[in-house]
Amino acid sequence: MCISDSLEAGVDLVCFSGDKLLGGPQAGIVVGQLELVELIARRPLARTLRSDTLTLAALQATLTHYLLDEAADQIPVWQMISAKPETLRAKARRIARGIPSATVEAALSVVGGGSMPSQTLPSFAVRLSGSTDGAQSVATKLRHADPPVVSRVQDGAVQLDVRTVLPRDERMLRKVLLEHLS
């Protein structure tokens, strides 16, 4: 159930995180009946928990994307969640091209976090197999690269879910893979 559904159903207060699925800065947000929100704001503890101006500015920018109906295009977490499988397959192929032992395979992305801990989405991954070092060793090598590459080991191979690779990071990821796997 989304926040607006909860409020429309008559819930007095809803507390949620500004990061996670909202895609903004890390912040605790309280919405609901004005008199209750004001009551919370007047409590002495609220002063120690309030957000600073930078957090509020980042939150305002994030919420503006929602108001302009551009969250899916402008907020990275929603770019990742809304990516189409055919787009992910093409991205995986671009990343895997020319990398020894790299293949492209269907995968499942776990949205994760406290908001959607078991929600999965169809995805594609670059599978790195056939290494004489073993999958754990390859994963460790990639984690210690500059920049680090976080992967998962599944079925004896390293798997890189491309859903979490932003377009601006594709070239850098290929560079790291070529440097450490050739």
What are the roles of these predicted feature ranges?
Residues 55-56, 60-112:
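Conserved PLP-dependent catalytic core of the aminotransferase class-I/II
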Residues 21, 81-82, 158:
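Glycine-rich phosphate/diphosphate-binding loops and the adjacent beta-loop-alpha structural elements
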